[in-house]
Regions:
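Generic structural signal for residues in well-ordered beta-strands
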Residues: 60, 142-146, 216
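RNA substrate-binding interface of SAM-dependent RNA methyltransferases
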Residues: 69-165
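Active-site/ligand-binding-proximal alpha/beta "capping" segment
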Residues: 158-200, 204-205, 214-217
C-alpha cells in the first residue's frame, strides 16, 4: 500500500495536494477507490480510500486510523556540513535507514560553509529530499531536520543519549560494542552518532564529545569518506537494533 505524507492534520475526509495527487494517480497510476496510507502534519497515520479527483486534487475518505510503529531507541545523526550533493545523498540515505533526527552542524574542518541565509534557502530542498525518501521507502513518520545549532548545543540538547563519534584513530571499540551496553541493561536511550566533515574532526572536537560522555568508535580498517561514514554508521546501528 502506497504511503504518503500531507502538510495538514488528518481528518475523516482529506484533500491531497496537487503534487501528491499527480504522483499517486498519474505516476503510480493508482485508480479511484485505491487504498493509501497517509501521515498528516499531526503525525497521525490512517488508511484512506481515494474517492475522486477534482481540479487536480484527489479527495480521500478515512477507512481507519492506525498506529505508527515506534522504535525502542531514537537514532540521531549529527552530521558536519558537507558540500552540495554529498550532503543531499546523506540525507536521502539516512532517511531510508530510519534515522529519527538529523542535526546539520558546522565544525572546524568543514569545507562547505552555510550562513543563516544559505541554510534557509537550502532547508526546503533538504526537507523535500527527506520527504521523497520517506515515501519511497515506506516510512510512516518523517525524520526531523534541525539546522542552525552548534555541535556543543546539540550535545547539551541530547545529553541523555548514548553519544558515539566516528574516529579514524579509534582502533578497537565498535558500534556493536557500544550498543551491547544499552541492550544488556534494557534502557531506551537514544543513540546519537557524530560524523565529521571531509577533513574529519579536530582532536579537540573529539575530546569535547568524549567529555560530554561520548565514546569514539571505529567503522573498520579503512578510512571512509565523510558521506560514506554516515551511512556506514547508521547501517551498523540499523542492523544491530532492527535485524
Amino acid at each position: 500500500m502506497k504511503k504518503i505524507f500531507i502538510p495538514t492534520p488528518l481528518d475523516e475526509s482529506i484533500v491531497l495536494p496537487k503534487d501528491v495527487t499527480h504522483h499517486i494517480l498519474h505516476v503510480f497510476r493508482h485508480n479511484i477507490e485505491k487504498l493509501i496510507t497517509v501521515t498528516g502534519s499531526d503525525n497521525r497515520c490512517g488508511i484512506y480510500q481515494i474517492k475522486d479527483e477534482i481540479n487536480g486534487l484527489a479527495q480521500a475518505s478515512l477507512i481507519e486510523y492506525i498506529d505508527s510503529p515506534t522504535a525502542m531507541h531514537r537514532t540521531i545523526l549529527v552530521q558536519s556540513y558537507l558540500k552540495g550533493e554529498k550532503l543531499e545523498w546523506v540525507l536521502q540515505k539516512a532517511t531510508e535507514l530510519n534515522v529519527d533526527t538529523v542535526y546539520l552542524v558546522p565544525t572546524s574542518n568543514c569545507v562547505a560553509k552555510y550562513d543563516a541565509k544559505k541554510l534557509q534557502s537550502k532547508y526546503s530542498r533538504w526537507e523535500k529530499i527527506m520527504l521523497e525518501a520517506s515515501q519511497q521507502c515506506g516510512r510512516t513518520q518523517l525524520p526531523t531536520l534541525v539546522v542552525g545549532e552548534t555541535l556543543s548545543n546539540v550535545l547539551d540538547m541530547e545529553s541523555e543519549s548514548l553519544k558515539l563519534v566516528a574516529y579514524e584513530n579509534e582502533e578497537g571499540y565498535t558500534i556493536k560494542d557500544a550498543l551491547k551496553a544499552i541492550n544488556s541493561d534494557s534502557t531506551n536511550r537514544d543513540i546519537l552518532i557524530c560524523i565529521g566533515p571531509e577533513g574529519g574532526f579536530q582532536e579537540k572536537e573529539i575530546n569535547d564529545i568524549i567529555e560530554c560522555g561520548g565514546q569514539s568508535v571505529t567503522l573498520g580498517n579503512t578510512i571512509l569518506r565523510a558521506e560514506t561514514a554516515a551511512i556506514a554508521a547508521l547501517s551498523m546501528v540499523h542492523y544491530e537494533l532492527e535485524l
